[in-house]
Design a protein with these regions (language model features):
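Conserved small/aromatic sequence motifs within transmembrane helices
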Residues: 1-160
């Protein structure tokens, strides 16, 4: 991302082919190499391997209070169900034509991500965590896969 990118374009929302993302940044994001420094945070105990992804404060405020209170109960993670399902978030937001991207994120994406994190809390187990680790590796290799639908049939329904 470019310096001061939060004050340009769509702010904290990144669209497909966003002018703020450099070519090198696109490579890092696509391969998820940009996440390697988070391993240090896992070792320090600041985050876990599986859990809700940390978000910027301005995006955090978009989540309904009832969901925020639940998400606060567990440590953030390097990957999780939201990371897998929203692997293509940039494409989803880019496809939005008749609505402001921030508004769409607030009305549709943030509440659904919150429901996914609550689903994770309600179903947290070694088995679920191992499946999420496996699925994370798969979405890096095959970004368009929908294998999570085979592993987790009881996920909240998505209305967009």
């Amino acid at each position: 991302m470019l310096k001061n990118s939060l004050n340009m374009g769509t702010g904290s929302i990144t669209l497909k082919n966003d002018f703020r993302v450099t070519n090198f940044g696109k490579f890092l994001r696509k391969t998820k190499i940009n996440e390697l420094p988070q391993i240090y945070n896992i070792i320090r105990g600041d985050i876990t391997l599986i859990g809700p992804r940390p978000v910027l404060e301005q995006d955090w405020k978009l989540y309904p209070d009832s969901i925020l209170n639940r998400i606060y109960e567990i440590k953030p993670g390097l990957t999780g169900i939201g990371s897998i399902i929203f692997r293509d978030e940039e494409s989803i937001l880019t496809a939005v034509k008749n609505e402001d991207h921030q508004e769409f994120y607030k009305k549709k994406i943030a509440p659904y991500k919150g429901k996914l994190e609550i689903w994770y809390q309600n179903n947290q187990s070694m088995s679920v965590d191992l499946k999420l680790i496996f699925l994370t590796a798969l979405v890096i290799i095959i970004p368009t896969n929908r294998f999570h639908e085979n592993f987790f049939q009881d996920l909240p329904e998505r209305d967009f």
